[in-house]
């Protein structure tokens, strides 16, 4: 019995969402990795469709982490600021290339007094979203420390990084241009994909989370295909080894029976 709710029509991804800036992207391919497309077409995605991928959202107090999540998950924007106490999370279900895929978006507190509590929930993340305020240089400078703290609980080689500038609607074109240069530099240094969004207007929010879902899905399928291939090779080696042992055993038996 399927206990999961059906995937919403606006959460179906048949193509790879593109990056915002090619100079600060995790990759610039126009399509999903060929091995991922092939695995989906041949229904060889293993347990990917049954897994829940964890995404943590970190950043300074009041940079707009909760508003970002709420705009995507609930299509709402609350002008009355309420600080997140500890952690909270939302579950979002997608269908990517015909395969069900779930993201668990963890909204963590930016307040120093809740940092220890929030950090206990960092472990096991497959993607880390570091949010800063496009109108606050200090919040951008603090992103590296947020990343350092998050990576203490995760393997840097197995996690996707996204650097997201929020409150774009409050920036003038000139202000945004200056901040974007600095943000792109930081994104390149930490090997993160850069995005600029507005939770108030919704600008780039949907596109951003679709990109997160697609790249996380792609990474999961590639990892599963790789594991399946490794298991297959191990089985072949084991079978060949067993065959060889059987041959040697038979030869020994034959030798002992000969005069």
Swiss-Prot record:
Q: Where is this motif: Switch 2?
A: 108-127
Keywords assigned: Acetylation, Cell projection, Cilium biogenesis/degradation, Cytoplasm, Cytoplasmic vesicle, Cytoskeleton, Golgi apparatus, GTP-binding, Hydrolase, Lipoprotein, Magnesium, Membrane, Metal-binding, Nucleotide-binding, Phosphoprotein, Prenylation, Protein transport, Transport
Q: Name one Pfam family in it.
A: Ras
Changing residue 82 to Q: what effect? Abolishes interaction with RILP and localization to the peri-Golgi region
Indicate where a lipid (S-geranylgeranyl cysteine) is covalently linked. Answer: 257-258
The cysteines covalently paired via disulfide bonds are none
Known EC number: 3.6.5.2
Origin: domain of life: Eukaryota
User: Which cofactors, if any, are listed as required?
Assistant: Mg(2+)
In this UniProt entry, the residues modified to N-acetylmethionine are: 1
Where, by residue number, is the motif Switch 1? 71-89
- Annotated catalysed reactions: GTP + H2O = GDP + phosphate + H(+)
Give the top-level enzyme category.
Answer: hydrolase
Q: Does the keyword Metal-binding apply?
A: yes
Q: How is its activity regulated?
A: Regulated by guanine nucleotide exchange factors (GEFs) which promote the exchange of bound GDP for free GTP. Regulated by GTPase activating proteins (GAPs) which increase the GTP hydrolysis activity. Inhibited by GDP dissociation inhibitors (GDIs).
Q: Name the residues that bind Mg(2+).
A: 66, 84, 107
Task: Indicate where this protein resides in the cell.
Answer: Cytoplasm; Golgi apparatus; Cytoplasmic vesicle, Phagosome; Cytoplasmic vesicle, Phagosome membrane
Annotated domain remarks: Switch 1, switch 2 and the interswitch regions are characteristic of Rab GTPases and mediate the interactions with Rab downstream effectors. The switch regions undergo conformational changes upon nucleotide binding which drives interaction with specific sets of effector proteins, with most effectors only binding to GTP-bound Rab.
Q: Quaternary state and partners of this protein?
A: Interacts with RILP. The GTP-bound form interacts with REP15.
- What is the protein's name according to its record? Ras-related protein Rab-34
